[in-house]
Amino acid sequence: MPNNPVSLIRKKRDGVSLSADEIRWLIREYTADRLPDYQMSAFLMAAYLNGLDAVEAAALCEAMLHSGVVLDLSDIPGVKVDKHSTGGVGDKLSLILAPVAAACGVPVPMISGRGLGHSGGTLDKLESIPGFNVNLDLDRYRRVLRAHNLVLIGQTDDIAPADKRMYALRDVTATVECIPLIAASIMSKKLAEGIDALVLDVKVGSGAFMKTTEQALELARTLVSIGEAAGKRTVAYLTNMDQPLGYEIGNWNEVREALDVLGGGGPEDVRELSLLLAGTMVWLGGKAGSVEEGIALGRAAIDDGSARQVFIDVAAAQDADVTVLRHPDRYPTGGVSVDVVATDAGVVRGFDSYALGMAAVELGAGRLRTDDRIDPVAGITLTSKIGDRVAKGAVLATVRTATRTAEVAERIAETVRAAIRLGPGSQNPPKWVTHVVNRDGTFLY
């Protein structure tokens, strides 16, 4: 009996699981414009209310994946490995871990996104480097990857077009916050890259889209389940986003901090998390016998300068003016800067990371509308982490913008002040990593 969209929507509405073939049929009909938006919207709401089981989520991902181009990188030697982050504040880890893994011999075909809401995007950070071209055709994409073990580009319209259309529907039908739909959306785009393995950084906390450990674990398990069902080794880590990563928020700010780490310095949290994720990529890529060995190899690639050189070489291959990567102090800056000063002494008890991310967007580091232009120098430089003691009159942060007035910068500085919570006594810093999820289960880290 042929499939009927109304009967499939009714089944999902009533909490009945659909078969993989039924899911594939729905997506195929929708992609071919034989299923209207109103029926897909009804299906999405039914899925939101009743959930999708592992078979349904994997089938949805597979159907969206094959709605467009799936890259075949089998002619590129080695195990291709990528990393995906669910988004946070000050998250510049991709700029570090990708060249580290590449320097260790692992091909990294990284397709990244732009900023989303309060969360910064890797593409916007890369484009703060003058001339960096994230829009390469497939032939050049392969050439750069083959030459340097790394390529850094943006998503194209050819990759998972069904997901793009369905995401737009979810955005206007209040069905975004559905973990199986989120997971299928993420994995359909990642698997289209032609990778063999994937490392996932699932953020949890005030600056993450997942606010609780329970939500983050459910997402991590679903992502790993989909990846493994597709035959890709997949490992997820739950990492803390109750405070920004490092001290820099903004596009060029974060590139500069990533260069500090690639140069052997930089903040400890950024360095160690980058090495954990890169070390896992090196292990999955077959260049190390364990994650620990992969971390050691990654650390050596930073120490000997090879990881930093890979980043510079890839930037040059993608048309960037690498002068500012070799000499970050030559980057053109200007505009307005305002210091945020502590009105009382105390200990940093916490941050409203979401508010800090949105403050950076208001300064010009992100988009309030889709046609907004990014200000590459806009951002926030913090001076402390949770648990640090701060003196009265000390600078808590500096806000910078080249496209906003001094009055706007002063107002945003007050938002930043309110987002840094000071108090008496002492405060233990949060653990950077709490859990690891892989095909064998969920484990405390």
Name each model-derived stretch:
Residues 79-102, 106-118:
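Glycine/serine-rich anion-binding loops at beta->alpha junctions
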Residues 125-151, 221-227, 231:
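A glycine-rich helix N-cap at a beta->alpha junction
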Residues 49-50, 95-109, 189-194, 226-230, ...:
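Alpha-helix C-terminal capping segments
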Residues 1-90, 310-317, 321, 432, ...:
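Acidic, glycine/proline-rich low-complexity segments that act as flexible tails and inter-domain linkers
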Residues 146-195:
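Phosphate/diphosphate-binding glycine-rich loops and adjacent basic-rich segments that engage nucleotide
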Residues 111, 145, 153-156, 201-205, ...:
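Short beta-strand segments
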